[in-house]
Amino acid sequence: VLDSYLKNEIFLTENELKLSESNLVIMSSKEDMLMRESAAILKAENKIVLNVGFGLGIIDTYIRNHGPKEHHIIEAHPQVCEKAQEMGFEVHCGKWEEVITSFIETEKKFDAIYFDTYVFDYKTNPQWAPFTRLVPKLLSKGGTYSYFNNIAAKVEGVEGIVQEFGWKRSSKDLKHPFDSKPYTLVWFTKNT
């Protein structure tokens, strides 16, 4: 599925990121409030931050505005990667599995990690659990891990995996910008 997405041409505007072939919206500026709140909980000021999945760059713009010490972005889609670079971001272009390996090998640690990669079906996202299992190797003590969790929290096993680590779970209810259901922002703090 990921390889299919990476081969698709995308259409980028200021407000939307779509697959050209199907016109399917991957990300919309309607998510601005969710991304702003997510960036705020990461507490990026003078921190080393990793975001996996650039999209329109909404969360990364907010992270950058918080003044991180280092700001790492991983983006798999070549067109999105190019757009991120045009916007002045330094991006690790490639699949997260490939980039993360080099971080683990060099024992790179992050104070905050946010994970929001595109998949066709968030409920069965095969990426969340494998990525989440690697987070303890990447996250500094006292660090924060969060993800696009309105749907991700329902992905079988993701929250259970993090709870196995014994990390502190925090949440904040928000009004969802384009859905009548509330959005619960969830993040975890590594306390060991």
Regions found by a protein language model. Give the residues of each.
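C-terminal substrate-binding/active-site "lid" region of AdoMet-derived donor-dependent transferases
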Residues: K123-N191
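Conserved SAM-binding motif I beta-strand of class I
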Residues: E70-E75
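S-adenosyl-L-methionine
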Residues: A76-E105
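A generic alpha-to-beta junction signature in SAM-dependent methyltransferases
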Residues: K43, G67, L138-K141
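Conserved SAM-binding loop of SAM-dependent methyltransferases across substrates and taxa
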Residues: L56-P68
